[in-house]
């Protein structure tokens, strides 16, 4: 069966027709059949990756120290977070409490999905306008500047855990027998990330001078997204990008990288890298949390590069508010601004998600463009 699936895939893209999508990105076949990547994956010269990229200085935050009750450790953690989040929104979390064996199992299980035949992965195909499922380079959604990657995304709502296991159930429904352990591992991982995200929200609340539990309570009921990112080897990495320049529209991203590296952040008018640290999670502020802070904390432009030697794997947990919860900053973060101005209108996450899924390709202007779109929509 696997041989038959592969045999039906043309040299550039497979044309496996479905109701939702008409094509699939298959890097293995592209590398086998051509010395050049298709034009759809070639980025403009001004966006092509640079070979001269220096590491970004990002603080290491001792989360266990912050939570220990030691006022000195808590003060240092909030100071470091505030400085980083005000400038570029990126920091590293160490002593995070996530079991290293869970991380090992999570990486181990990625190959069972992403190295399966294209027709097998298609069982979990992501539908247009939805955030769950398999996506191959956004082929079908976009026709140029395609990212050299595959993803598998899951919705995660912690309050549903009592009634169902959202990640595990999605895998079971879409992939069927043979993926039980796969579903269990990523269900456990998503739950661990949700727990970690709420601890980080306590830290962010204190660093902003609001009540410590304010943001934690805001996100206790949430509609988050958990994503597996797989970046295959690329014969011409100097022409392509694994993920194009963008700011995350979500509230908070918790990323774990394998040892390969590829994350770059645009700070001080230049691209800088964040090298892998197996014992730390990379955390960055997203557009929605920037709005919650009235622009005080920054959502920064970043991208992922690829290479010709090794595949790259990452896990990203995107913390998002409950869909219909109104996103607006606490009064302390409005009154502290000159003339008490609001930088962004009230909105809900479901509105913002719809905008990024159906109307706008995320970049550095997503939140501003959404604000304009929202005002125009409300004027009718």
UniProtKB/Swiss-Prot annotation:
Q: What is the lineage of its organism?
A: Eukaryota, Viridiplantae, Streptophyta, Embryophyta, Tracheophyta
Protein name, UniProt field: Gibberellin 20 oxidase 3
Catalyzed reactions per annotation: gibberellin A12 + 2 2-oxoglutarate + 3 O2 + H(+) = gibberellin A9 + 2 succinate + 3 CO2 + 2 H2O; gibberellin A12 + 3 2-oxoglutarate + 3 O2 = gibberellin A25 + 3 succinate + 3 CO2 + H2O + H(+); gibberellin A53 + 2 2-oxoglutarate + 3 O2 + H(+) = gibberellin A20 + 2 succinate + 3 CO2 + 2 H2O
Bilayer-spanning residue ranges: none
- Keyword Metal-binding belongs to the record: yes
Any one GO biological process: gibberellin biosynthetic process
Query: Pathway, per Swiss-Prot/TrEMBL?
Result: Plant hormone biosynthesis; gibberellin biosynthesis
The record's induction entry says:
Negatively controlled by the level of physiologically active gibberellin. Not regulated by auxin. Up-regulated by paclobutrazol.
Its job: GA53 is less effectively oxidized than GA12.
Q: What EC number(s) does the entry state? A: 1.14.11.-
Keyword match Oxidoreductase = yes
User: InterPro entries under this entry?
Assistant: DIOX_N, IPNS-like_FE2OG_OXY, IPNS-like_sf, Iron_ascorbate_oxido_reductase, Oxoglu/Fe-dep_dioxygenase_dom
Designated gene of the protein: GA20OX3
């Amino acid at each position: 069966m696997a041989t038959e699936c592969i045999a039906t895939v043309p040299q550039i893209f497979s044309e496996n027709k479905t109701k939702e999508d008409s094509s699939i990105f298959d890097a293995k076949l592209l590398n086998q059949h051509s010395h050049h990547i298709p034009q759809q994956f070639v980025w403009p010269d001004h966006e092509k990756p640079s070979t001269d990229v220096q590491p970004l200085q990002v603080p290491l935050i001792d989360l266990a120290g912050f939570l220990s009750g030691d006022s000195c450790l808590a003060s240092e953690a909030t100071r470091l977070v505030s400085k980083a989040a005000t400038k570029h929104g990126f920091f590293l979390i160490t002593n995070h409490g996530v079991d290293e064996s869970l991380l090992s199992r999570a990486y181990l299980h990625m190959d069972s999905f992403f190295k399966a035949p294209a027709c097998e992965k298609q069982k979990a195909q992501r539908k247009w306008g939805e955030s769950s499922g398999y996506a191959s380079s956004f082929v079908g959604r976009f026709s140029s500047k395609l990212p050299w990657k595959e993803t598998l995304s899951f919705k995660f709502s912690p309050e549903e855990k009592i009634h169902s296991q959202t990640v595990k159930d999605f895998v079971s429904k879409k992939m069927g027998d043979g993926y039980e352990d796969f579903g269990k591992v990523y269900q456990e991982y998503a739950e661990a990330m949700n727990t970690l995200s709420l601890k980080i929200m306590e830290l962010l609340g204190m660093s902003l001078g609001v009540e410590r539990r304010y943001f934690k309570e805001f996100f206790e009921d949430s509609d988050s997204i958990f994503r597996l990112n797989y970046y295959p080897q690329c014969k011409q990495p100097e022409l392509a990008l694994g993920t194009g320049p963008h700011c995350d529209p979500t509230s908070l991203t918790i990323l774990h990288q394998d040892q390969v590296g590829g994350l770059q952040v645009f700070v001080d008018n230049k691209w800088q890298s964040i090298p892998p640290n197996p014992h730390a999670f990379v955390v960055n502020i997203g557009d929605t949390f920037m709005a919650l802070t009235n622009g005080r904390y920054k959502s920064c432009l970043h991208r992922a590069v690829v290479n010709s030697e090794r595949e790259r794997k990452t896990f990203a947990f995107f913390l998002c508010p409950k869909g219909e919860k109104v996103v607006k900053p606490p009064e302390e973060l409005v009154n502290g601004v000159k003339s008490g101005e609001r930088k962004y209108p009230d909105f809900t996450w479901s509105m913002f998600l719809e905008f990024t899924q159906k109307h706008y390709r995320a970049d550095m202007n997503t939140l501003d463009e959404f604000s304009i779109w929202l005002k125009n929509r409300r004027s009718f």
